């Protein structure tokens, strides 16, 4: 599953609408998930979860997570649900234009050939948003795969991807459907008549057409997705949908010939959310907010020029993105109807230029890069009206703001022997606030979080050192790192319910009022270990560990947070897996994930207990390309705490779920 990116370029696939991995990436922390790992995954974020400390904001996968908490972070230092990692598919960002989260249902694993997880490593060629790193998805170029499976609680999944030729065109098509009746997250004795299952219906489809043009390749891709899900209580649900279009022209680098890429893309998204207030005994709910229309659109352009000569590889590039969107809501439910409306949104943009270079001299690899970005937020507004009289309640139009950010990175790697290597790196990165953070308040149960149009970009600096050993039977990697986030965007508690507060309005008993703020800094030091052993033919053992001690320094902005841990950031996390082929047609595998306790709030008052989950799978090959399998997720039915309210009501992750299915790979 894990390996360093090769220093020597892989064999060039002429149908790929992407440049090959840059040689300089080997100087940074990169984990590669291969096709075998993706073959066993039903959801991409679950496959990424095999890497310690990588995951969504809460201890939930995208199977049960609200769209707004599906943002990804690659180290346990992110203080909110906004994604701190940039996720791209062949160069096109998948992060939502409005909120920065990722709707993972839009990317069935069957449509991918591999994934590179770049932990930290700086903004580099990736662009804004790569604060804790980047996830680089590679779409399938050849062959195909499909999966059909059914599971407990009305679960079913059908997904497939294929390729073929149509005259001079090469096509790649992928589609997926998934549903589940879900589980009830709150359990007795806390559960009441208002608690409901986290049901889900999701679908996606994409088509890519590749046209060779001399030594270059022109690729056009279109995609659509939609998901509907319950939120666990009566009257609360969410629906997310979107489209993506991209056009990419690529020329692969060759001996003595430069390579280049020019890409334009457009994404649209919409989100609907219904939020409720829950009675103290959870016997009933009342509507609190209806986010009925959240249209957002993003456009992007990027280009790169890469050359290689005499062991020196260089890349020059530009990257520009623009997003606009707004939320339309009804709130303040009184007398059986909503009494107020809200329109809030604006526009953000970022544009940058960068230069990257790497040089190989004997056992040494040296890599570095410099980047300059201009960011801006403009045309912001938050307008609230009384629905009966149409009178203005709030008309807030914050001033336009902009700035520049310089990012840099430097890495070195030395081969100490045919098996051992050592590396060191220093880097910086930044993430501008999303439209969601700037302009949209939100509600979860009785807790309310206010927006803040004055947020400035988060900036991360870091250093790390690492060693690696690679042999035919044992791979070992170890990394020590220190990261610091300046102007960290934190949901800061500023009030307790019951009470009426400016802008936010009424906060019920047991609820809290928070506001997004640039609350000082987060400093983290950590250790990452990964081991993969192949003691004999047909047996592979893997284990990995992450230890991250992250602490907040709230400074004068939020002194009450100083010394505390970021919300939902455990110190310890570990994974282990075994793949065994006891007979030619049989494969047995098991995976375990453990993490220490974490906190569900900024004040570290809501404690979520440590969690250990184990999953197991047995697969029987029926033919060279067809297999039947059975899998038990959360085999021992562990209680995994995912959230806690101000009154102590705990939500849990899914119980044991057994799946059976057929998979074909060709």
What spans do the regions from the language model cover?
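N-terminal periplasmic "start-of-domain" segments of outer-membrane beta-barrel proteins
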Residues: 10-41, 66-71
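Short acidic/polar hinge/loop motifs at secondary-structure boundaries
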Residues: 92-119
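Surface-exposed extracellular loop regions of Gram-negative outer-membrane beta-barrel proteins
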Residues: 226, 268-272, 324-333, 376-392, ...
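Periplasmic-side early beta-strands and strand-to-turn transitions of outer-membrane beta-barrels
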Residues: 123-124, 136, 142-145, 149, ...
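Conserved C-terminal beta-signal and adjacent last beta-strands/turns
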Residues: 163-169, 211-214, 357-358, 413, ...
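Extracytoplasmic beta-strand/coil segments of soluble accessory domains associated
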Residues: 45-92, 96
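Gram-negative outer-membrane beta-barrel transporters
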Residues: 360-366, 374, 481-485, 506-601, ...
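Outer membrane beta-barrel strand-and-loop segments of large Gram-negative receptors
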Residues: 292-305, 346-354, 450-456, 462, ...
């Amino acid at each position: 599953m894990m390996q360093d990116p090769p220093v020597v370029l892989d064999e060039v696939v002429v149908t790929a609408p992407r440049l090959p991995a840059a040689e300089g990436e080997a100087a940074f922390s990169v984990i590669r998930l291969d096709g075998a790992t993706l073959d066993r995954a039903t959801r991409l974020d679950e496959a990424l979860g095999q890497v310690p400390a990588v995951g969504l904001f809460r201890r939930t996968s995208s199977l049960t997570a609200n769209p707004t908490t599906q943002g990804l972070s690659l180290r346990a230092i992110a203080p909110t649900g906004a994604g701190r990692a940039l996720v791209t598919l062949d160069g096109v960002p998948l992060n939502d234009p409005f909120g920065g989260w990722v709707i993972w249902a839009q990317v069935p694993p069957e449509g991918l050939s591999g994934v590179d997880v770049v932990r930290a490593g700086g903004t580099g060629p990736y662009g804004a948003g790569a604060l804790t790193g980047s996830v680089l998805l590679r779409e399938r170029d050849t062959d195909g795969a499909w999966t059909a499976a059914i599971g407990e609680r009305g679960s079913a999944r059908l997904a497939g991807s294929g390729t073929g030729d149509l005259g001079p065109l090469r096509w790649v098509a992928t589609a997926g459907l998934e549903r589940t009746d879900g589980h009830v997250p709150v359990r007795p004795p806390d559960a009441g008549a208002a608690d409901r299952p986290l049901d889900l219906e999701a679908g996606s489809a994409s088509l890519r057409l590749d046209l060779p043009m001399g030594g270059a390749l022109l690729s056009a891709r279109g995609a659509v997705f939609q998901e509907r899900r319950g939120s666990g209580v009566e009257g609360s649900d969410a629906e997310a949908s979107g489209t993506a279009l991209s056009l990419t022209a690529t020329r692969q680098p060759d001996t003595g010939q430069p390579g280049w890429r020019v890409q334009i893309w457009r994404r649209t998204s919409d989100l609907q959310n219904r939020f409720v207030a829950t009675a103290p005994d959870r016997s009933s709910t009342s509507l609190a907010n209806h986010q009925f229309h959240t249209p957002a659109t993003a456009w992007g352009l990027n280009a790169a020029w890469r050359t290689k000569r005499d062991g020196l590889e260089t890349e020059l590039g530009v990257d520009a993105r623009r997003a606009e969107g707004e939320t339309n809501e009804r709130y303040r439910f009184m007398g059986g109807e909503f009494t107020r409306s809200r329109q809030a949104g604006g526009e953000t943009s970022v544009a940058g230029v960068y230069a990257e270079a790497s040089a190989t001299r004997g056992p040494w690899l040296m890599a570095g890069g410099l980047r300059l970005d201009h960011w801006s937020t403009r045309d912001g507004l938050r307008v609230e009206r009384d629905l009966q009289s149409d009178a203005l309640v709030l008309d807030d139009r914050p001033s336009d703001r902009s700035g520049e950010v310089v990012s840099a990175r430097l890495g070195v790697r030395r081969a100490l022997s045919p098996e051992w290597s050592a590396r060191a790196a220093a880097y910086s990165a930044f993430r501008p606030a999303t439209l969601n953070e700037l302009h949209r308040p939100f509600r979860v149960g009785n807790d309310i979080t206010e927006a803040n149009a004055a947020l400035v970009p988060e900036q991360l600096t870091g250093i790390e050192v690492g060693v690696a050993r690679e042999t035919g039977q044992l791979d070992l990697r170890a990394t020590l790192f220190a990261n610091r986030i300046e102007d960290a965007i934190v949901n800061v508690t500023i009030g307790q319910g019951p009470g009426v507060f400016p802008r936010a309005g009424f906060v019920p008993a047991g609820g809290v009022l928070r506001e997004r703020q640039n609350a000082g800094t987060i400093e983290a030091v950590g250790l990452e270990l990964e081991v993969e052993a192949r003691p004999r033919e047909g047996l592979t053992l893997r284990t990995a560990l992450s230890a991250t001690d992250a602490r907040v320094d709230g400074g004068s902005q939020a002194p009450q947070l100083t010394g505390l841990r970021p919300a939902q950031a455990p110190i310890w996390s570990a994974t282990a897996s075994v793949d065994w082929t006891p007979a030619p047609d049989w494969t047995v595998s098991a995976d375990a994930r453990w993490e220490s306790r974490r906190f569900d709030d900024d004040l570290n008052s809501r404690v979520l207990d440590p969690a250990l989950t184990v999953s197991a799978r047995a697969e029987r090959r029926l033919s060279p390309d067809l297999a039947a399998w059975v899998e038990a997720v959360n085999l021992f039915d562990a209680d995994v705490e995912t959230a806690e309210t101000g009154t102590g009501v705990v939500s849990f992750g899914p119980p044991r779920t057994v799946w059976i299915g057929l998979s074909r790979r060709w």
